[in-house]
């Protein structure tokens, strides 16, 4: 009985240790369909999401500028909802690391600093060229395109990935969207392989 209990505890610890921690760059939070699906995946424990106030401010600022029809207050409400839903995801006290880092675009160093501070293994970003492996490998961090990241999530946790899609469809009410339309929207954000896997 004791051995079974130890095995159960060890199994739980191992399952927790294999959950990937990933920093979500502003450019993957910018498109609502992709942001929603990433958060639905996280809500089912497929991975642990990480962001900072600076990352949140960046996507909100850029989206508000590109879409003046969307009120900034609504976007900020989304940010607050994210912080409430994932209370451990908003990383702080990483700023002191920034000056020691080197990236092609110095303005991206705060993202890497957040990854280092949170011990994340992945930076999910659409701009892979801004996060070369030569700059990330010393910290045991890698950059992944959202399609690569989500595709990997589907491979590891297919049932949860499908459930996340179902939850996303159910949550969309204004206006409601069909499963096919949600998949089409996800594909338009660059999730080519991922959508193919979700359809198969």
Language-model-derived ranges and their functions:
Residues 2-36:
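Metal-dependent nucleic-acid phosphoesterase active-site entry motif
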Residues 4-8, 128-200:
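Acidic, PIN/NYN-like endoribonuclease modules and their adjacent C-terminal/linker elements
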Residues 21, 32-66:
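PIN/NYN-family metal-dependent endoribonuclease catalytic core
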Residues 28-29, 99-107, 129-132:
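Acidic, metal-coordinating catalytic cores used for nucleic-acid/nucleotide bond scission
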Residues 46, 87-88, 140:
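A generic structural signal for alpha->beta connector loops
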Residues 50-94, 168-193:
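PIN-domain endoribonuclease scaffold, especially VapC-family toxins
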Residues 87-122, 156, 176, 191-200:
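Active-site neighborhoods of divalent-metal-dependent phosphate/nucleic-acid chemistry enzymes
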Residues 108-142:
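Acidic, metal-binding active-site segment of PIN/NYN-like and related structure-specific nucleases
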